[in-house]
A protein has these predicted regions:
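Short, charged, surface-exposed secondary-structure boundary motifs
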Residues: 20-26, 116-119, 171
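Active-site phosphate/pyrophosphate-binding segments
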Residues: 36-129
Length: 201
């Protein structure tokens, strides 16, 4: 801090003592500002739009409830999030939340890279909850999602395709918020303490 001040350089101060999983808006918002500065872009307007979205979160919570309704009877089973590249980080975060909050298992498969693995591994019914996150950016990847969804649903697997419209920061924050709720409700149903995470407590 003193070095930055001595050279009149901007710097960011991050408050200590918070668990990152409890302050994702703060943490991701700070990272967005830093990356924006490195790229020479002012991200404050975009972050204000996201903040405004969260001031009226009813639509996101409704989407989370819809997703929860799909998985409620199988909530204790493992989750596999099938995503495209744009949503890989969001998928990983949800799996971390399922592991930390609900003490469950979560795995990520990225299409098209894991396309063959998915098809070879899932040609039967599994005790698995599948969530699809596809930005729709690539026509060939879209076709893979469609095919895989058909395979899984025809075999009786539970699949929820989250209706993301694009890969924007706004959409990604929305999906994070909705899936965070899902992980909390999963912890409630499993009667586990979502505040107790042994490895970080």
């Amino acid at each position: 801090k003193s070095l930055a001040e001595n050279h009149s350089l901007p710097y960011y101060s991050v408050a200590l003592g918070y668990q990152p999983r409890m302050t994702w808006g703060f943490g991701l918002g700070t990272l967005v500002m830093i990356l924006g500065e490195l790229m020479g872009k002012d991200m404050s307007g975009r972050l204000r739009d996201i903040e405004a979205m969260f001031k009226s979160p009813e639509a996101i919570v409704a989407r989370a409830k819809e997703m929860y309704g799909v998985f409620q009877s199988t909530i204790a089973q493992k989750f596999v999030v099938v995503c495209d590249l744009a949503y890989e980080a969001v998928a990983i975060r949800f799996c971390q939340q399922i592991q930390e909050n609900a003490k469950g298992e979560g795995f990520v498969s990225v299409l098209p890279e894991a396309n063959h693995n998915m098809i070879e591994s899932y040609y039967e019914k599994h005790d698995t909850n599948f969530i699809f996150l596809n930005s729709g950016k690539n026509v060939r990847v879209n076709a893979r999602f469609d095919f895989l969804k058909g395979v899984l649903t025809d075999l009786g697997n539970t699949v929820y395709q989250y209706p993301v419209s694009d890969a924007s920061l706004m959409s990604q924050f929305e999906v994070i918020h909705a899936t965070d709720w899902l992980s909390i409700w999963a912890s409630d149903d499993k009667k586990v303490d979502n505040m107790q995470v042994g490895i970080i407590m």
